[in-house]
Curated annotation (Swiss-Prot):
Name the record gives this protein: Isoleucine--tRNA ligase
UniProt signal peptide: none
Binding site for ATP: 598
Binding site for L-isoleucyl-5'-AMP: 554
Annotated family: Belongs to the class-I aminoacyl-tRNA synthetase family. IleS type 1 subfamily.
Top-level taxonomy: Bacteria, Bacillati, Bacillota, Bacilli, Lactobacillales
Domain note: IleRS has two distinct active sites: one for aminoacylation and one for editing. The misactivated valine is translocated from the active site to the editing site, which sterically excludes the correctly activated isoleucine. The single editing site contains two valyl binding pockets, one specific for each substrate (Val-AMP or Val-tRNA(Ile)).
Catalytic activity, reaction form: tRNA(Ile) + L-isoleucine + ATP = L-isoleucyl-tRNA(Ile) + AMP + diphosphate
Amino acid sequence: MKLKETLNLGQTAFPMRAGLPNKEPQWQEAWDQADIYKKRQALNEGKPAFHLHDGPPYANGNIHVGHALNKISKDIIVRSKSMSGFRAPYVPGWDTHGLPIEQVLAKKGVKRKEMDLAEYLEMCRDYALSQVDKQRDDFKRLGVSADWENPYITLTPDYEADQVRVFGAMADKGYIYRGAKPVYWSWSSESALAEAEIEYHDIDSTSLYYANKVKDGKGILDTDTYIVVWTTTPFTVTASRGLTVGPDMEYVVVVPVGSERKYLLAEVLVDSLAAKFGWENFEIVTHHTGKELNHIVTEHPWDTEVEELVILGDHVTTDSGTGIVHTAPGFGEDDYNVGIANGLDVVVTVDSRGLMMENAGPDFEGQFYDKVTPLVKEKLGDLLLASEVINHSYPFDWRTKKPIIWRAVPQWFASVSKFRQEILDEIEKTNFQPEWGKKRLYNMIRDRGDWVISRQRAWGVPLPIFYAEDGTAIMTKEVTDHVADLFAEYGSIVWWQRDAKDLLPAGYTHPGSPNGLFEKETDIMDVWFDSGSSWNGVMNARENLSYPADLYLEGSDQYRGWFNSSLITSVAVNGHAPYKAVLSQGFVLDGKGEKMSKSLGNTILPSDVEKQFGAEILRLWVTSVDSSNDVRISMDILKQTSETYRKIRNTLRFLIANTSDFNPKQDAVAYENLGAVDRYMTIKFNQVVDTINKAYAAYDFMAIYKAVVNFVTVDLSAFYLDFAKDVVYIEAANSPERRRMQTVFYDILVKLTKLLTPILPHTAEEIWSYLEHEEEEFVQLAEMPVAQTFSGQEEILEEWSAFMTLRTQAQKALEEARNAKVIGKSLEAHLTIYASQEVKTLLTALNSDIALLMIVSQLTIADEADKPADSVSFEGVAFTVEHAEGEVCERSRRIDPTTKMRSYGVAVCDASAAIIEQYYPEAVAQGFEA
């Protein structure tokens, strides 16, 4: 035999190269076949519940890396809870109604208005379900464990019915009303939009400064006075019915030199505006407060028969403009509020497609609203004082990426104002992570208007409202409950398939319909009402779930989206929030911190990562970043993550290989019988177990990542395993020293594998398949380890911390000797430590082979007073390094004075010779092969 065969060189088939792109699908198939999700749920039956409610992604297209961050985060939380004594079912969901699907069909050539509505809606449904299947496969490829067979989908009949019941409950409490308030109007979608459907972009717009002539100055202003107005939306001048001034602002009337006109404008802006208007000199003739100007009458700039009333408004500022804003109640929220309060007419001159209407005047009719600025300037004539291009933030339809307008049209609203304080009180009771989320959502609810819930589209849940002959809206509990029952049985498509009377309860009558005739609403609900009702359609509806949920986890954009709409509906119906805690995440940016976009070519798809690295690397990346803020990802970042994964994997592979002959039931050594350094590592590892368990409970993935990486690279690879291999390789297979270390190896291997399972389930399962002494078939069916504490552990940790400092100093001395060519490898060294009594006491207390721990062949501890002049000192401790005496033992690779050529043909030290002669007599008799 060969000499190396006398060494216990750990053997394992566990591969160094992970091959994740190929292996992960195999593991996922094995989990499906074994029905792991259901088995885990069955194991947890009767345990305390933890319910994370899945915010539904929109079912359109493959998932992006933001989806991956979110879904992996949820999976880590649910897996860790499931392995930590909680019944934690996870029901995934999809949002399936809305404009994007209509747009996809339109791009495919489907013409909605030229076909039967029921047929069109069926096409929408089929497409949505195809996208659900696509995304389900994408999420499963990430290794996400969920009830994939029973997801919630917002287009299913039972869900639609529960959504209608939420609406009915809100209507029954008087929270639903119809109004003609200005709403965000998307001409590109031909529909109203909610605030959550708006995004802002910087654009260039033409702003106009023009003047309205005073018609009735109320004894305050002369009729030859003109009030100077500013607008950034010239098309709205066609619907202007008032001029708003700040009640406490100071205004002046000025006369430019050479002009026959007087102009009123804010006093603080006179100089800047005079320069803008080309007034070289002017005279201030009178001063006025805004309150003094109230109810002065002016003429519309070109339609002089239309009067525009001066009114007061707190929204007027002097940050820009003239201190006076023209007021078109049909085209703005502030305009509407002050206009209604002062009896102004609400005029809308733009239709649903963005085209100017007949009431705008014959010159404007039929033109696109954004193209009429030249005509407005022409109509203003000499009343136009200046025109300039400004760059400002403007709202866009987040789906079509087209600008929107404010437009007053009859819509259905949910009144937030009626129960706003209840919502705010519930926010105060909710836990937020990060903490700033509480203030963000609080301020949003505090400042938001009522919620426009109607949409002028086809693909969605119909508003369950009927109209009597006299126009009375009917949405009583009796009616909405009946509609909900119909939806539960037939789906919401029944709304379009039946006449109004056939949708009402049998024999239904209403005093407003003496002839028994009814009409039904044709608008659908805002999709945020769909997803915002999920607490009722899912958490409150399924027996294995509970409401309110323990946790909602989504991107920070959902403060104005799902967090917001769910909170409103839940408080409206039941008086409490739908969640106990909210965790939000930032956006995923590219490696340079830029937003990802196809046009920039900087997008990274999960499928790309899976093909190149494997989903495990994406999962590990999720734990390596602070996702409460925006995070960065790139292929270079993922390469670094892959390198970290490799270190973790290879360390665990070493532990597998070097416990392959270890049976924990027969060979394990009790803690009190372990060596001193083994006890230290056991204590140290249990601290890591405690840190990781607490971090899982706090959803602090980064803390887990840091704890694992630090323990694997510093405590294990750079310390314990670095010298332990000299014991497990060299000592006799059954020696107490080797079994002590194998006990620690195996304990770390099993427990660390469990701890890593929520993050790296594929790798953990692969490792588990090599642990033949563990009972559970799959590691996902095991329980998380519980951290142990040991008597005197604080003192032990303190002693070893001091030793680790000494070891670092010794390594510096060895490095200097290496550089000076005194030694090559550290095993060639004889290290002398000139120790104080304190250091001697420490080394004695450790009760360990210090030479082994220092990875030197020979070590001497001398008195501090005896240090020679050529010693080197680090932090008060002196060292000398000499070449060790003796020859290299061919078996242990240590230099030992007892090393000599043996009769069986190898030069080994006495310790190795004793092992060879006891355990390998045949080799002793025959000699070793060269």
